[in-house]
Amino acid sequence: MTIKVGINGMGRIGRMVIRAIIESKNKNIEIKHINNRSNSEASCTLIKYDSVHGKFDADLDFDKNHLIINKNKITFSQESEIKNINWKKFNVDYVFECTGKFNSKEKLLSHIKNGARKVIVSAPVSYTHLTLPTILLV
């Protein structure tokens, strides 16, 4: 079964998620959609050239609505609000929330309402009545 993922936010962590998935060469994980505030051209450049990790060894290209990584066309959008991202339309099951902006249950539920089955959050999440542990996956 292929795990179909989307990435919201392409800061340091979002870009590292992309690199990790591509470099793993795991055929069971497929990036279906990326949402980032900057355009696809700038996002492509940021993935390709990293000041810490160096040049990404992948074939990267873009058009207005896609990032193309190793000939795989990934849909791309520039939405500021989760409520405007239709994960179901992009066939996404799991969303990596990497903006750091949406860190409460109320805000994150928009991903689920828009079609994602699960959300993996890269920043601590605040709940009004619960303290949740932060889990580091290495």
Predicted feature locations:
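N-terminal Rossmann-fold NAD(P) dinucleotide-binding loop
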Residues: 14-15
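A structured beta-alpha segment of the ubiquitous adenosine-cofactor-binding alpha/beta core
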Residues: 54-106
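Conserved small/polar residues in nucleotide/adenosyl-binding loops
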Residues: 128-134
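Glycine-rich phosphate-binding loop and adjoining beta1-alpha1-beta2 segment
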Residues: 31-69
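Glycine-rich Rossmann-fold phosphate-binding loop(s) that bind the pyrophosphate
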Residues: 10
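A short, Lys/Arg-enriched amphipathic alpha-helix followed by its capping loop at the start of a domain
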Residues: 20-28
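ADP-ribose/adenylate-binding Rossmann-like module
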Residues: 94-126
